[in-house]
């Protein structure tokens, strides 16, 4: 046995092994993991056309086997959460070795660790990776960064076995939990429970049989869970039932989801978000809400860009219960809530905020599609001037009358104002009756009961078709009657006394032998103006369908508007499970779809995730639950039925108005917009570095529309090619990595919940050209808007509330719409000092006003001096129409923290509040106005419409704090604290020593000091970090004798850190030199206030204070903690931190911290935040911390799984979905892609047991080597012996005796890991040997195992030819991580040994002691401990039985607890028990 190898374990260790093994055998339970799991349909086999076999997992390895077997678990795969691919045989996830520069990474099966990036795959590129790693025959790959068009390259060789579907055909969709203790968070699949892995919802652990899942990876560790949604035909579990209407309701008070997530959760239960269509239903809901305090999502939304408010379940919007002043801000708040505080009143809110929600369903409802409208036109007799349709007669009354007079006129003719009950009837009225008339009365009104619309003829309201933002003013008694207007026949509520034409309707007289009118169609064909339609019932290929229609003198069907779509859907209603060919195709595989006639596609009705990613294909209509939706199918192999359409020439009835006229090619573009001679539109990119200038999709759409433009739509490759070139001219043609995470909103979206998850362009252009990035796996339920990715020049699905840049598009020859056309609005900019100002008299909300200012490269005005205030006041008196008129200025509170900010980012150094203003800080954003006749300010709701003032300046503002002083000149007295080149002292520990501001300043002057001046975030961080033991507020040197704040030395205020709602003190008098408002630093226990500033009365309050003076050159400086030396640990409060100063990705930093028995840092409070700010500023580099976002989400959590009680986000953050967080040099938290390399990170060193590792690997490391432990890192173990200075040969021998080899380094991350650990030994050795040799046969360097050196990190001047010889050895420097060549003899270095992780040693009889007496003792101890284990198990199971026996079926519990107060329940404890405990 070589020296250094661990000695044989003594017999007590064998005893413990015996006990554990027998105990495990005793506790083990039969049955394969997941036996109780729900059978899942999304399991598939992966087939390779190139290798002619299926992917199989065996023993941790992956291979392709020619024997495909659908019943063999090792070949069964499924997509699971976080883009991982799960194998049902191994119960593991597909992955590779840790990614590095080595391209020969091994493919294998790994534990499904949540954080491991090497387990994540994109379904579109999985085939490429499998071909590369398994050696399948491949074709060329398109060059990164080029403009692709969704082509399948090597991925096309990999398909789902038994079909032609690609590997994205069975994607994973998030499953949102109900009840439990996870606030509605989605399941984490797979998850571990009771040492078993589950790849779906399970009933294991529950005797009631209800399915549940964990919402974190390991239930046993976190105990986070929820019930799984199930589709059932009853309302027994989790539902309240209204016996009168037979509707069922589910109140999810403890969940917090966005509107779209809540809608998906309801849909997963065969339900929808709550719709309220009757007063009785509102009353019933109010009764269920009694006693609760909550705001909950309902199905009301305004997400259809071409329509108005609607219910997500397609119920008619006929009853409304808006609160007063609602809906407001309709352009940005598109989803509805019901509020208990207003007795069930409704409000509109931003759809992205997280709230509880209510689901609704009808029991015994099926998944069958809604029955189609009746389109058959039965013959009826009508009087002259009346026109027949479906048994009724209709007439246009051209004379303009009020609604009541119009109704009387209809009654005199034997009818009533028209009622509309279907899309078919609406089409007839729009085409045949309305014709060219712009707006007419219809019979809908709410005259009898406010907010409850009904038809004047008494018929049931079963169909509504509102205009965008309508109905919006129903609460006004003057808007009780409804009109129909516009080319699509949408509806608007209007004042009843308005004079308009109208439409009458009455029952018709059935004709003798009344039969359907055929309008000349052949037998078996169906008429719909202006064509005849025929269903071909044979299943044929696309070319055969074309030929068959041609043989009948017709063509495959074209669909040009929503009316034709509704009619065609009615034709195929009874053909469930079938497909029908249409004339839409991409036969040439261009990526653009066209009708066979060559016409452009002006209307589309795609199914979810269609038209997909591949180019080419032909379009068929689906049936069943996807009735009438369009899907792309293979033109040659897929067989479907077909629909022929035969035009009868001249339309019998007028057609709908066509789309807007096609713009001219000769029209000019507005200034600043670009175009190409072949394009009919002009384009402009709106981009800014500032987060506050970026916009959500809805805001970007509004910004374009305010200019008279639309968000970019792309109808062809040529159009997108021009836009790509335009972007390259602006941002440069760099490598894709340079432009990573730079996205631009385009108009493509699937926000409308009634659109079947179909992508649509916001400007109404048909979605016929597609270029989605096939490497993205973004087909989940919540990414409803699309972006153009600058790096790949392709499209990516994104959450609509993400703040991004955008691109607008406007027709040639169109002028950009100015915000104000009045003479006053067109006044020139007025100049004052170094800025220009413009006064806009038209009224806008605060956000709209700010947006208009940005069009002129300006902002809403900021005010920084009395002179500037006087200038504004003087001009306001000229522009204002009333003395008390209010004008918006740029001051506003942030929604994230309630702090006041100027829109231009300038410092708040001047205030002019009116008496009683500003109002106390609340949860709603506040915006500030200036009064015309007085020089004072007030705050009010930002949605109020006011005139406003814009300001622009060419003066550049300092954005970064100044550099640190190079050295501290001198030191501080013993009772003072030194920070850089200043000394500080906190006074006021005793209550009697707390004084007024002037007395504090005098006390400091007596010590040759002054009250502290805080000039940058670094000094502020030092002050805040000094506050944990301070229990009182502290005066600082900031004060205001006039209206502007300044420091005691009359230094201008260049940095501020005001608390939420501050400065808010009384405005100082304009005259007088004595300070009346002075600032304190708050010690508040609230994280939002700690260390912030507040302005207080200088003469009426007493506080502690902080004195400051310069260092004394005669004194020695204190040891400087900043910047810290490499490898040093810093202690603060109860925490210890290690700073990593290396180029690291986030996951690399996490691994490196874990190799130090630490984790990435957790920031629990503003004190620790201030301490880390000093560290980041001292190193002059951003630092990773342990806060990361869930995949594709802006939900962020600590890797240490601590609660997220404190955050330090920069405004607008977290911006990056699924990103990682760093502390920037100014202390603010920002997010970026986890793959970004930053130059440092912060580890939080645990004082207790090592934290659980977030990334796991097979095997373990030996217990120890002499006096040095083995350190695990990825797949290997390392032992550092830098105290031993050995020659190269001796180092090799020592590592061989330990079972390993001298250090080899295979990629950059491994080099960083070694370098980080070597820095701890920098004083003992200048470096460590590398196990590298020169191979004279190949003339190359090889590692000790003869593998080639594919990665290197040579220091200057590099590796010369003279160093490539048998006599050369190589080493790594401790202080730099660089590699050096040198001689093999007469040089000694430290030793680092490396060996692969080993599997846990199995139990072996040879490990038992040989002494018979010892054996007897072992066996007796085993029996004794086994008896104890058995007793414990019986008690445990009895307790389980008691817990579960108290609950026979999960009962629905409507709890009013907030999420933070919600009781966290183990899955084995029933809801009933928890309710009883609370009572």
Curated annotation (Swiss-Prot):
C-type lectin domains 3 to 8 are not required for calcium-dependent binding of mannose, fucose and N-acetylglucosamine. C-type lectin domain 2 is responsible for sugar-binding in a calcium-dependent manner. May play a role as endocytotic lectin receptor displaying calcium-dependent lectin activity. Internalizes glycosylated ligands from the extracellular space for release in an endosomal compartment via clathrin-mediated endocytosis. May be involved in plasminogen activation system controlling the extracellular level of PLAUR/PLAU, and thus may regulate protease activity at the cell surface. May contribute to cellular uptake, remodeling and degradation of extracellular collagen matrices. The chain crosses the membrane at residues 1415-1435. The gene is MRC2. One of its GO terms (biological process) is endocytosis. Residues 244-360, 389-505, 528-644, 678-809, 832-951, 979-1107, 1132-1243, 1273-1393 form the C-type lectin domain. It is found in: Membrane. Residues 182-230 form the Fibronectin type-II domain. Gene3D superfamilies: 2.80.10.50, Fibronectin, type II, collagen-binding, Mannose-Binding Protein A, subunit A. It is a single-pass type I membrane protein. Changing residue 1464 to A: Increased cell surface distribution. GO terms for cellular component: focal adhesion; membrane. Residues 41-167 form the Ricin B-type lectin domain. InterPro entries: C-type_lectin-like, C-type_lectin-like/link_sf, C-type_lectin/snaclec_domain, C-type_lectin_CS, CD209-like_CTLD, CTDL_fold, FN_type2_dom, FN_type2_sf. Ubiquitous with low expression in brain, placenta, lung, kidney, pancreas, spleen, thymus and colon. Expressed in endothelial cells, fibroblasts and macrophages. Highly expressed in fetal lung and kidney. GO terms for molecular function: carbohydrate binding; collagen binding; signaling receptor activity. Residues 1-30 form the signal peptide. Disulfide bonds join 54-68, 93-112, 187-213, 201-228, 266-359, 335-351, 410-504, 481-496, 618-635, 704-808, 785-800, 853-950, 927-942, 1078-1098, 1220-1234, 1369-1384. Keywords: Calcium, Disulfide bond, Endocytosis, Glycoprotein, Isopeptide bond, Lectin, Membrane, Phosphoprotein, Receptor, Repeat, Signal, Transmembrane, Transmembrane helix, Ubl conjugation. The keyword Phosphoprotein applies. Its main location: membrane. There is a cross-link at residue 1142 (Glycyl lysine isopeptide (Lys-Gly) (interchain with G-Cter in SUMO1)). This is C-type mannose receptor 2. PANTHER family: MANNOSE, PHOSPHOLIPASE, LECTIN RECEPTOR RELATED (PTHR22803).
């Amino acid at each position: 046995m070589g020296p250094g190898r661990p000695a044989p374990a003594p017999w007590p260790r064998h005893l413990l092994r015996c006990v554990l093994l027998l105990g495990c055998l005793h506790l083990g339970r039969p049955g394969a993991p997941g036996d109780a799991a729900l059978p899942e349909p999304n399991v598939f086999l992966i087939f390779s056309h190139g290798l002619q076999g299926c992917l199989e997992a065996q023993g941790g390895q992956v291979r392709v086997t020619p024997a495909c077997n659908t019943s063999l678990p090792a070949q069964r795969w499924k997509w699971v959460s976080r883009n991982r691919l799960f194998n049902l045989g191994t119960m593991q996830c597909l992955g590779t070795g840790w990614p590095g520069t080595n391209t020969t990474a091994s493919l294998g099966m790994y534990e499904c660790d949540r954080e491991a990036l090497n387990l994540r795959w994109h379904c579109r590129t999985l085939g490429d990776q499998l071909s590369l790693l398994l050696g399948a025959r491949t074709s060329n790959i398109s060059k990164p960064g080029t403009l692709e068009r969704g082509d399948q390259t090597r991925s096309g060789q990999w398909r789902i076995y038994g079909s032609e579907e690609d590997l994205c055909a069975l994607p994973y969709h998030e499953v949102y939990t109900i009840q439990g203790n996870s606030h509605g968070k989605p399941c984490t699949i797979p998850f571990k429970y009771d040492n078993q892995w589950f790849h779906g919802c399970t009933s294991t652990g529950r005797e009631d049989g209800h399915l549940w899942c964990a919402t974190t990876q390991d239930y046993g560790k976190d105990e986070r869970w929820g019930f799984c949604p199930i589709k059932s035909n009853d309302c027994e579990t989790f539902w309240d039932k209204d016996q009168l209407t037979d509707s069922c309701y589910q109140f999810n008070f403890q969940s917090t989801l966005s509107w779209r997530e809540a809608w998906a959760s309801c849909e997963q239960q065969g339900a929808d978000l709550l719709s309220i269509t009757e007063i009785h239903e509102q009353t019933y809901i109010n009764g269920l809400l009694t006693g609760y305090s909550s705001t909950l999502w309902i199905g009301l939304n305004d997400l259809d860009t071409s329509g108005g408010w609607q219910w997500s379940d397609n119920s008619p919007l006929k009853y409304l219960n808006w609160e007063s002043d609602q809906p407001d801000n309709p352009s940005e708040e598109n989803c509805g809530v019901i509020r208990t505080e207003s007795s069930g009143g409704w409000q509109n809110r931003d759809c992205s905020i997280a709230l509880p929600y209510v689901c609704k369903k009808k029991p015994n409802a099926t998944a069958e599609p809604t029955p189609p409208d009746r389109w058959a036109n039965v013959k009826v007799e009508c009087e002259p001037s009346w026109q027949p349709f479906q048994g009724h007669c209709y007439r246009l009354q051209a004379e303009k009358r009020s609604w009541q007079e119009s109704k009387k006129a209809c009654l005199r003719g034997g009818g009533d104002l028209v009622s509309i009950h279907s899309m078919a009837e609406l089409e007839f009225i729009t085409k045949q009756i309305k014709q060219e008339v712009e707006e007419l009365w219809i019979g809908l009104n709410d005259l009898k009961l406010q907010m409850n619309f009904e038809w004047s003829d008494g018929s049931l309201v079963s169909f509504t078709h509102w205009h965008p933002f309508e109905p919006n003013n129903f609460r006004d008694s003057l808007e009780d009657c409804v009109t129909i207007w516009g080319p699509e026949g949408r509806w608007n509520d209007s004042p009843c006394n308005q004079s308009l034409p109208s439409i009458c309707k009455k029952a018709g007289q059935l004709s003798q032998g009344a039969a359907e009118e055929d309008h000349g169609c052949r037998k078996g064909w169906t008429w719909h103006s202006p064509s005849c339609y025929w269903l071909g019932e044979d299943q044929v290929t696309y070319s055969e369908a074309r030929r068959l229609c041609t043989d009948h003198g017709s063509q495959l069907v074209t669909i040009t508007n929503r009316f034709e779509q509704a009619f065609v859907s009615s034709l195929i209603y009874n053909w469930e499970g079938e497909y029908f060919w249409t004339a839409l195709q991409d036969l040439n595989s261009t990526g653009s779809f066209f009708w066979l006639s060559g016409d452009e596609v002006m209307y589309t009705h795609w199914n979810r995730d269609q038209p997909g990613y591949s180019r080419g294909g032909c379009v068929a209509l689906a049936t069943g639950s996807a009735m009438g939706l369009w899907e792309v199918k293979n033109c040659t192999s897929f067989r479907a039925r077909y629909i022929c359409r035969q035009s009868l020439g001249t339309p019998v009835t007028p057609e709908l108005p066509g789309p807007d006229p096609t713009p001219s090619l000769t029209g000019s573009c507005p200034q600043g917009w670009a175009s190409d001679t072949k394009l009919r539109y002009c384009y402009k990119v709106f981009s800014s570095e500032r987060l506050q200038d970026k916009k959500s999709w809805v805001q970007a759409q509004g910004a374009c529309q305010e200019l008279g433009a639309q968000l970019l739509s792309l109808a062809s490759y040529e159009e997108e090619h021009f836009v790509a070139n335009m972007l390259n001219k602006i941002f440069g043609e760099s490598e894709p990595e340079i432009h990573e995470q730079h996205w631009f909103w385009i108009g493509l979206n699937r926000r409308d919940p009634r659109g079947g998850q179909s992508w649509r362009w916001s400007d109404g252009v048909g979605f016929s050209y597609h270029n989605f990035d096939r490497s993205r796996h973004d087909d989940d339920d919540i990414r409803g808007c699309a972006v153009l990715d600058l790096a790949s020049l392709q499209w990516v699905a994104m959450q609509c509330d993400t703040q991004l840049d955008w691109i607008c598009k406007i027709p040639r020859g169109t002028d950009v719409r100015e915000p104000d056309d009045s003479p006053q609005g067109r006044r020139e900019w007025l100049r004052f000092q170094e800025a220009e100002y413009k006064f806009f008299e038209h009224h806008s909300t605060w956000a709209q006003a700010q947006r208009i200012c940005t069009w002129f490269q300006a902002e809403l005005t900021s005010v920084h001096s009395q002179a500037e205030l006087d200038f504004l006041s003087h001009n306001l008196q000229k522009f204002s129409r009333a003395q008390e008129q209010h004008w918006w200025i740029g001051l506003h509170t942030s929604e994230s923290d309630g702090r006041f900010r100027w829109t231009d980012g300038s410092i708040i150094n001047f205030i002019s509040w009116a008496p009683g203003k500003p109002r106390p800080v609340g949860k709603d954003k506040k915006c500030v106005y200036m009064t015309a006749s007085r020089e004072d300010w007030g705050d009010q709701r930002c949605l109020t419409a006011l005139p406003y003032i814009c300001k622009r300046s060419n003066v550049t503002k300092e954005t970064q704090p100044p550099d640190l002083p190079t050295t501290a000149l001198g030191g501080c007295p013993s009772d003072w604290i030194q920070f850089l080149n200043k000394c500080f002292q906190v006074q006021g520990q005793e209550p009697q020593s707390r004084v007024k501001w002037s007395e504090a300043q005098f006390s400091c002057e007596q010590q040759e000091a002054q009250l502290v001046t805080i000039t940058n975030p670094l000094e502020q961080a030092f002050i805040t970090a000094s506050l944990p033991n301070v229990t009182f507020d502290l005066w600082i040197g900031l004060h205001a004798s006039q209206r502007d704040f300044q420091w005691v030395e009359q230094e201008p205020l260049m940095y501020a850190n005001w608390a939420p709602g501050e400065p808010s003190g009384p405005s100082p008098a304009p005259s007088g030199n004595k300070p009346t408002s002075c600032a304190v630093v708050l010690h508040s226990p609230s994280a939002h206030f700690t260390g912030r500033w507040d302005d207080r009365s200088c003469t009426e309050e007493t506080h502690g204070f902080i004195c400051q003076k310069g260092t004394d050159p005669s004194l020695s400086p204190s040891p400087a903690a900043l910047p810290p030396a490499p490898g040093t640990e810093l202690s603060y409060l109860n925490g210890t931190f290690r700073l990593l100063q290396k180029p690291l990705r986030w996951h690399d930093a996490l691994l490196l911290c874990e190799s130090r028995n630490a984790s990435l840092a957790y920031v629990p409070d503003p004190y620790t935040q201030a301490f880390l700010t000093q560290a980041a500023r001292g190193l002059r580099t951003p630092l990773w911390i342990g806060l990361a976002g869930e995949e594709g989400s802006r939900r962020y959590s600590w890797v240490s799984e601590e609660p997220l009680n404190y955050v330090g986000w920069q405004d607008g953050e977290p911006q990056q979905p699924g990103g990682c967080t760093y502390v920037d040099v100014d202390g603010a938290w920002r997010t970026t892609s986890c793959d970004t390399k930053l130059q440092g990170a912060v580890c939080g060193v645990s004082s207790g047991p090592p934290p659980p590792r977030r990334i796991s690997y097979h095997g373990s490391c030996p217990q120890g080597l002499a006096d040095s432990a083995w350190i695990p890192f990825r797949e290997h173990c390392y032992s550092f012996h830098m105290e031993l200075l050995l020659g190269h040969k001796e180092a090799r021998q020592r590592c061989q005796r330990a079972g390993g080899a001298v250090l080899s380094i295979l990629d950059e991350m491994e080099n960083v890991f070694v370098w980080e650990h070597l820095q701890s030994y920098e004083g003992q050795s200048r470096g460590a040997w590398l196990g590298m040799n020169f191979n004279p046969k190949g003339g190359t360097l090889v590692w000790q195992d003869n593998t080639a050196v594919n990665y290197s990190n040579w220091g200057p001047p590099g590796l010369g030819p003279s160093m490539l010889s048998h006599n050369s050895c190589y080493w790594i420097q401790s202080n730099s991580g660089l590699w050096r060549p040198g001689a093999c003899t007469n040089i000694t270095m430290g030793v680092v040994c490396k060996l692969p992780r080993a599997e846990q040693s199995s139990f072996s009889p040879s490990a038992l002691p040989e002494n018979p007496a010892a054996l007897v003792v072992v066996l007796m101890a085993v029996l004794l401990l086994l008896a104890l284990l058995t007793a414990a198990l019986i008690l445990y199971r009895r307790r389980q039985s008691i817990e579960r026996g108290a609950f026979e079926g999960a009962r629905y519990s409507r709890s009013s607890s907030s999420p933070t107060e919600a009781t966290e329940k183990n899955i084995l404890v029933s809801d009933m028990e928890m309710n009883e405990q609370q009572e």
